[in-house]
């Protein structure tokens, strides 16, 4: 019994290191831009298989998962199996099975990525401890701050590590982040910022407020600089979900006002820098609010002061009002899009037309990507509509569909810029249905266990990413993190777990009453002792696996 508990604890520490490596170390793993996609893919693939094999070895020698981690009646496990199986079918029936297996026809997101992310999901779900949220969130906050600072440096053409020394200026302007494509940065921020902001929203006491406030400060900077409309969509969706929860009070709104002040401060500063100094890359949608940076900062500060001093510490529930605001916002947005696109006589709304009217130019030509992806799927035979053209084969299928009518713009699209449309084309109706089943089964379980520690922030992070996916790409730089968050969500949804305490001992002296001796409570290790070993293991494993991936997957380079 004791050996099983010790092995389980060791496996839990290993799972913690795995999460730190993928969520915090892997986003900082970079190389020359020319091979960025395959470098990221092979690095995380090697890392995931290494940890999964290690945890599998611990399982074989007696590290049994806790009771309740897996159940034959759990729909989330069946949904995972359906997701993997439909990916397998689409790969076998692909236009090019080899390319689909490795994802060489797209953004290195083939069936191999489905396999190692599913294995990572099962490993984390089996052994990840329930009490890791605070430390994990803080580490994600540190990574967020580093990513944001490097992103800003490259906007001003400052490249600290020389990752682009062999790259043309035009490429630097298009992919201006030191950490690679803006799709990676926006996808990373889409799930990282809700974790960072939520930790700040619920922090109690001066120490924890400052501890989580610093990453939140850099999170406000990320909102002001990351060039991706999808990030605004994802964070907006997470905020709407948060407003509908019963935990939404005046205290929550007060902390949101602080985050708003952070954002407007950075947006105003970036607006000044862009107008007075050379910058490269695009300008985010939210950055337009930099024109009102000072006004927004003052309004947020005034709101914070009103809620802080006017209510004198009282917390008033706002979730009913929040649900009304969320319903009005969603209904109004849907109505505006419907009128702008389907009512010919709808009046122009000026610059908002660029956002509301979906055509080929919409969203930096995302409208073109959506149209050609949808038309390519419609033109497939029935069996391909059901099973798909193969994972990662969007570009190949589209080129065959377009034929001689292909345009230079169409040639640039290697993804649909909508994960759900791409899932429909590449894995067919079955694959899309399996993925939606996987998502819905997890979110339903989260809704039933919202008040359990850890469920709310991870759910908000996933909601943000899933909304972001409507206008983005499933890249190998982000999808492994998302699958691990789905696994972590299931761990947090479980009832509180604890190891069995040592049995009480009874001593009976001669002629005396029995005396019960209770065991001494086990002292919990400090923060450094708890997190230093898994953090060090995460860094070492990322470095080792990154180097080993060049040897193991050398044929892909």
Model regions and ranges:
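Alpha-helical transmembrane segments of multi-pass inner-membrane proteins
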Residues: 6-29, 48-61, 81-84, 88-93, ...
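Membrane-interfacial, low-structure loops and terminal tails that flank and connect transmembrane helices
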Residues: 1-9, 68-72, 310-321, 497-532
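Juxtamembrane membrane-water interface segments that cap and precede transmembrane helices
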Residues: 29-43, 99-100, 165-179, 276-287, ...
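Interfacial loop-to-helix junctions that mark the boundaries of transmembrane helices
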Residues: 37-46, 71-73, 105-107, 283-293
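Transmembrane alpha-helix boundary signature
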Residues: 59-72, 90-102
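Signature aromatic-anchored transmembrane alpha helix within multi-pass, membrane-resident enzymes
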Residues: 137-144, 213-217, 515-547
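TM-adjacent membrane-interface loops and short helices in multi-pass inner/ER membrane proteins
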Residues: 181, 365-412, 427-431
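Hydrophobic alpha-helical transmembrane segments in integral membrane proteins
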Residues: 339-351, 540-557
């Amino acid at each position: 019994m004791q050996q099983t508990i010790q092995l389980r604890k060791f496996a839990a520490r290993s799972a913690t290191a795995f999460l730190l490596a993928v969520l915090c170390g892997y986003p900082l793993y970079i190389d020359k831009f020319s091979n960025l996609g395959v470098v990221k893919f092979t690095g995380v693939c090697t890392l995931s298989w290494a940890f999964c094999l290690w945890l599998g070895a611990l399982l074989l020698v007696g590290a049994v998962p806790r009771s309740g981690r897996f159940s034959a009646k759990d729909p989330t496990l069946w949904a995972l199996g359906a997701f993997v199986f439909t990916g397998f079918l689409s790969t076998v029936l692909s236009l090019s099975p080899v390319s689909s297996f490795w994802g060489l026809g797209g953004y290195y997101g083939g069936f191999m990525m489905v396999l190692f992310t599913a294995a990572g999901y099962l490993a984390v779900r089996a052994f990840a401890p329930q009490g890791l949220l605070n430390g994990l969130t803080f580490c994600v906050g540190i990574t967020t701050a580093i990513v944001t600072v490097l992103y800003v440096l490259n906007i001003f053409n400052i490249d600290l590590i020389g990752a682009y020394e062999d790259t043309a200026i035009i490429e630097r302007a298009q992919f201006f982040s030191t950490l690679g494509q803006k799709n990676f940065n926006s996808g990373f921020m889409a799930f990282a910022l809700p974790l960072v902001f939520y930790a700040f929203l619920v922090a109690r006491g001066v120490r924890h407020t400052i501890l989580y406030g610093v990453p939140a400060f850099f999170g406000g900077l990320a909102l002001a600089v990351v060039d991706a409309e999808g990030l605004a969509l994802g964070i907006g969706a997470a905020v709407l979900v948060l407003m509908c929860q019963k935990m939404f009070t005046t205290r929550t709104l007060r902390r949101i006002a602080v985050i708003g002040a952070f954002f407007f401060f950075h947006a105003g500063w970036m607006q000044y820098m862009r107008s007075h100094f050379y910058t490269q890359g695009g300008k985010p949608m939210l950055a337009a609010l930099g024109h009102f940076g000072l006004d927004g900062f003052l309004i947020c500060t005034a709101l914070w002061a009103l809620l802080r001093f006017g209510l004198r510490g009282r917390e008033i529930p706002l979730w009913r009002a929040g649900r009304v605001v969320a319903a009005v916002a969603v209904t109004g947005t849907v109505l505006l899009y419907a009128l702008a696109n389907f009512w010919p006589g709808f009046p122009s709304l000026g610059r908002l037309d660029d956002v509301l009217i979906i055509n080929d130019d919409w969203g930096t030509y995302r409208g073109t990507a959506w149209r050609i992806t949808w038309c390519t799927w419609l033109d497939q035979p029935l069996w391909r509509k059901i099973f798909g053209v193969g994972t990662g084969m969007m570009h190949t299928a589209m080129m065959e569909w377009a034929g001689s009518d292909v345009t230079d713009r169409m040639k640039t699209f290697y993804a649909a810029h909508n994960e759900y449309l791409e899932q429909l084309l590449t894995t067919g109706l079955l694959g899309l249905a399996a993925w939606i089943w996987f998502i819905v089964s997890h979110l339903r379980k989260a809704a039933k266990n919202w008040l359990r520690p850890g469920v709310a922030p991870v759910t908000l992070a996933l909601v943000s990413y899933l909304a972001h996916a409507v206008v983005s790409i499933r890249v190998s730089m982000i999808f492994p993190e998302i699958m691990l968050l789905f696994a972590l969500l299931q761990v947090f949804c479980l009832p509180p777990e604890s190891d069995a305490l040592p049995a009480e001992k009874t001593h009976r002296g001669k002629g005396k009453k029995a005396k019960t001796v209770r065991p001494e409570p086990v002292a919990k290790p400090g923060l450094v002792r708890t997190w230093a070993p898994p953090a060090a293991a995460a860094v070492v494993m990322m470095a080792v696996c990154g180097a080993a991936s060049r040897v193991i997957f050398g044929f892909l380079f």
